[in-house]
Amino acid sequence: MRRSSNNFADSADGSTTKKLRSITAVLVSLLLPGQLLPGPFLQAQVPPPANQPAPKSAPKLVPGKSDPLILHMLSRFTFGPTPEDIAAVRSLGSHGIDQWFDLQLHPDRIPTSNGDQILTTRLAEFPALELPVDQLLERFPSGAMIRQSANGKLPMPDDPYLFAIYRRHIQMYEDKQAKKEQAQNNPESPKPESPKSESPKSEPAKTEGPQQSPAPAPTQADMELSQAIESATSMNPKPAGVTPKPAASTSAVRPSYADLLVKSVLALPPAQRVHRILFMQPVEYEQFHSSLKPPQKAQLIQDLNPEERELLTDFENPTRTVIEELQAQRLLHDVYSSHQLQEVMTTIWLNHFNVYLHKNEETPYYLVSYERDVIRPLALGNFEDLLIATAESPAMLLYLDNSSSTGPDSIAAEKQKERAAAGKAGKTTPPGLNENYARELMELHTLGVNGGYTQQDVTEVAKVFTGWTVDHPQLGGGFKFDETRHEPGKKLVMGHKIKENGQKEGLELLHILANSPATAHFISQELAVAFVSDNPPPALVNRMAQTFLSSHGEISSVLRTMLHSNEFWAPDAMQAKIKTPLEYVVSAARASGADITNSQPLINALNQMGMPLYACVPPTGYSDKADAWVSTGELVNRMNFALSLATNHFNGIKSQWTTASQPASTPAEAEQNLEARLIPLGVSEKTRAAVLDQAQPKPPAGPQSQPQLFPPTGDHPEKRPDAKGVSAQNTAQENQNAQIAGLLLGSPEFQRK
């Protein structure tokens, strides 16, 4: 899968960007203010009478009349309904809602879909994400791994390709340290010249390595490159007495070493190409890399297998490779997986048990396992199991600093006191008691901010979890209980006496918290906000909490209670939620049926909209309420994204809007077809009129015809391999439909669920 750092209109030129802004401004002024801002439509519903019995099943479906019910359910329990989803629920008969929901609660029973097959193919591009954390860190070394290898604390890898990767990053680290030292010693000295200006024949830094990894012998391409350089420098001798042209003029005709190097490398077969790059000397690689043009970068990796592509990205930036693959797989799961409820709940729990991506150098690597092995498998299971798994997760232990927490009266602390008294204290002292995890465990993970605990309870909980740490985190180790750092003695938490029992103290406390009525209400409130409304009816939350307690925290039972409630199906709950940026981006990709071979534009879109994946700094996670996401700037970003997505301005994401079954020729017909496809519940007359107004052909304003308000699709149909078979009329039709689709995807109705 290709990676790109492109922004929204990454394939558009300057005029295209200006047109994007123009049409966005027009539509935002016409459509959005007041339609998405919180108002009566989003206020809390009046709870039903207390004696109103809760239904035992979801509403029955009536052929031809139940699509609004199906769409409401799918809009809440998936990342946006697709025609395939709607047809699947219809096919299940009158009890289709309950049957579909039961299947979603048991993902292993769901038949493999076309989307699942696409997902499997896309995920195969990321073999690194299947590795355990320790192997992932070895294969894609973090900065700490490189520093330890440079300092001789870790051995260099035996694998010749990995050795080359480590050698490059060690050299980069040592160069950076040398520059820093030089700057400190000579603060007024001029900066050293860039390595790019040096000759490719300059002496490389010497790095010892395994004997089986010598520098490769020159390939045939290398010899041809040398011959080309010699030929270029010796051709056309000048007659005596003739003044030669200036060097700059000569270089304009003569190919540079770097250009010849790029051409020779690109001409190699895939495996040899990777080998040649990995064993370049630093200066040569810098020249090669800086001379690559965008088309050549695509050519460089287009026929490599996944392992070869990962080797090259590892050579450039190992941690960035892990982060990009982690973010890409998340979006691909959300877009393509048929296990939609599991993916929605995975997002909810990743946000509930938030871990910040950039906490330290190891966190990106641990997040791979955190999502893969902790959150997704338990997303529909038992809450206590999920709570324990997150508490023991290295990602959480590192993020909230519990891995460094040491009891003040622990064995480790007492030994440190003895060493200090004897004048033998080490350079570092135990960090002491850390209350971060204890506080967030009660406030954010279980009881809630008004859960009835005190600061003294926080301190006692912190003592319970002393010794819960990570075994050599810089090497990717797992959970470890360190008895020497655990605080001895009994603890008293909210009236519960916890006897001294080592690691089991923490398990006992987690059981108490997971089965607390306060936790049941807090989790039920959060789920009701996510699936019903920003201000869910208290009666519904109370019933969900009762189910939570009676089922001992079975998440599936709580969700069923919500599905079977009158409040979930109330008319004022329909379309009452505003999509978060993640929900909006993914639902647009699903609705468009986009073929995604490069997820980076979607990742960039989320960054632009203020919801970067895994990058919420505070432990609270992102808000699920409208007031956090509805603003003029946010709506402009969404409209820009919708237009860019629909008109194929994103590299590696393609949509098709004109089909043989819907050959609409007028804007009105196209709008009708696309509205039924993208927003089956329909749009308002105001929205429809605004869309058609922008889609209508505009007469010339003067002697020279005005350019289109919105440009044609960004992949230039005339340059496609099949351009000869594409008529100008069909191209114009596709452009018109793409523009209309983009306007609908940016409409207020599409931004609701």
Outline where the language-model segments fall.
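N-terminal accessory alpha/beta regions
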Residues: P83-I348, H352, L357-E362, Y366-S369, ...
